[in-house]
Amino acid sequence: MRKLLVDTIQGKKEETVFNLNDFPFEHLTTCDLCKKGTHRKYYNVASAFDIETTNVDGVKNAKGEYIVSPFAFMYHWQFCLDIFVIFGRTWEEFTEFFDKLSEECGAFTLCIYVHNLAFEYQFIKDFIEIENMFAKAKRRPMKFTSHKGAIEWRCSYFLSNMSLAKFCESSELCIHYKLLG
């Protein structure tokens, strides 16, 4: 765990950030449950996931053919459960974290919102077992489950039909910490 000073549009704010070894997984046991029809019970807690990625240009030979194809990779992931935030850098940390989180879920489901899930999906699909996908089109999931139903990933972009900045602007008590520019 460490404390970070974060620049926000309202000034600096101190935030606590956890790592894999000290994340308070047990917080789920304090969360209320809600039931969807006669199906599974869900944790009634806000949770969100995001990754940061970058692209690397390919290398072409004199004929214009790629000798090294362009590629993209994830260099940072972040998950928030209520007020608790964890940062990770590797896919090993990602898989270990979500395996531990799903164990803590037990027989209940944690719904995780991802803004533009279709984009994040292209990166995470190779690291978790996808189950029960509902998609708008090929490679455009609106929601899917993983970890034997313990985790349900939902696209907040499809739900809101707004950019993340606009969504935060129109949501009461929501502060968008990402600085513009």
Give residue ranges: language-model regions.
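Aromatic-residue detector
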Residues: R2-K3, T54-V59, F119, S163, ...
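N-terminal accessory regions of nucleic-acid-interacting proteins
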Residues: M1-I51
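Conserved DEDDh/DEDDy metal-dependent 3′-5′ exonuclease domain
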Residues: C80-G181
